[in-house]
Amino acid sequence: MWEDFFMQYSLILCRSLTYAQRAAHTLERAGITSTVRKAPQGASDRGCTYAVKLRSSALARSLHILNEAGIPIGRQFHLMPDGTLQEVGT
């Protein structure tokens, strides 16, 4: 329980549900646990954007794996403890 309380998560945006599901399955095969969810409001200007949620500690490895697999991804965000999003690299 406490582990989840202090765990930091990140989101990788995908342009469709299909791409988000492909990304999550690819990461799962590589041993990285992730979930697919609708992207939070404000994370994208597109209406049907989905996100892959994973531990922040696995973000860099996940981006490499998805790039190698040829899965298109969008912006990445860290989920802050107060519920806000912080774009990675800004």
Language model feature labels by segment:
Residues 8-11, 15-28, 32-63:
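Amphipathic, hydrophobic secondary-structure cores in small proteins
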Residues 56-90:
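C-terminal structural segments of small proteins and small subunits
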